[in-house]
Amino acid sequence: MDEKDLKIIEILMRDGRKSYTDIARELGTSESSIRKRVKKLEEEGVIKGYTAIIDPSKIGYNVVALTGFDTEPDKFLNVAKELCKFPEVKKVFTSTGDHMIMTEIWAKDGKEFSDLIFNKIGKIEGIKKICPAIILEQMK
């Protein structure tokens, strides 16, 4: 991977819909060169896919929470896998720091979020502590 690949990645991270022609023009190279480089980055797993960035509130999700989970050590991976099964859990990360597992959870409202945490997720075997932090405003 060279400097040009890194610039292509940076451009696609800003706008995943940007055409190869526009990227080539911006970097002063040919469209076919960009096409080959992007294909190689995809094959190597550097580019894993393309997605839309959604404003949860515009589609009815008024509660977004970053939620930390502490687990029994021997249940750690099982808890992470179980969390992945919930459609409301949009992202699951294993981490160091304050919590063993961090998630991003979307809910329609506080009642739905509470029900999810206490009556569904909270019943996963091995969870010792749940620490939700509701997002007030996304700055970036």
Swiss-Prot record:
<dbReference type="GO" id="GO:0043565">
    <property type="term" value="F:sequence-specific DNA binding"/>
</dbReference>
<comment type="function">
    <text>Participates in positive as well as negative regulation of transcription. Binds to its own promoter.</text>
</comment>
<dbReference type="InterPro" id="IPR011008">
    <property type="entry name" value="Dimeric_a/b-barrel"/>
</dbReference>
<keyword id="KW-0804">Transcription</keyword>
<keyword id="KW-0805">Transcription regulation</keyword>
<protein>
    <recommendedName>
        <fullName>HTH-type transcriptional regulator Ptr2</fullName>
    </recommendedName>
</protein>
<dbReference type="InterPro" id="IPR000485">
    <property type="entry name" value="AsnC-type_HTH_dom"/>
</dbReference>
<dbReference type="Pfam" id="PF13412">
    <property type="entry name" value="HTH_24"/>
</dbReference>
<dbReference type="InterPro" id="IPR019887">
    <property type="entry name" value="Tscrpt_reg_AsnC/Lrp_C"/>
</dbReference>
<feature type="DNA-binding region" description="H-T-H motif">
    <location>
        <begin position="20"/>
        <end position="39"/>
    </location>
</feature>
<comment type="subunit">
    <text>Homotetramer.</text>
</comment>
<keyword id="KW-0238">DNA-binding</keyword>
<dbReference type="InterPro" id="IPR036390">
    <property type="entry name" value="WH_DNA-bd_sf"/>
</dbReference>
<dbReference type="InterPro" id="IPR019885">
    <property type="entry name" value="Tscrpt_reg_HTH_AsnC-type_CS"/>
</dbReference>
<dbReference type="InterPro" id="IPR019888">
    <property type="entry name" value="Tscrpt_reg_AsnC-like"/>
</dbReference>
<keyword id="KW-0678">Repressor</keyword>
<dbReference type="Pfam" id="PF01037">
    <property type="entry name" value="AsnC_trans_reg"/>
</dbReference>
<keyword id="KW-0010">Activator</keyword>
<dbReference type="InterPro" id="IPR036388">
    <property type="entry name" value="WH-like_DNA-bd_sf"/>
</dbReference>
<feature type="domain" description="HTH asnC-type">
    <location>
        <begin position="1"/>
        <end position="62"/>
    </location>
</feature>
<dbReference type="InterPro" id="IPR011991">
    <property type="entry name" value="ArsR-like_HTH"/>
</dbReference>
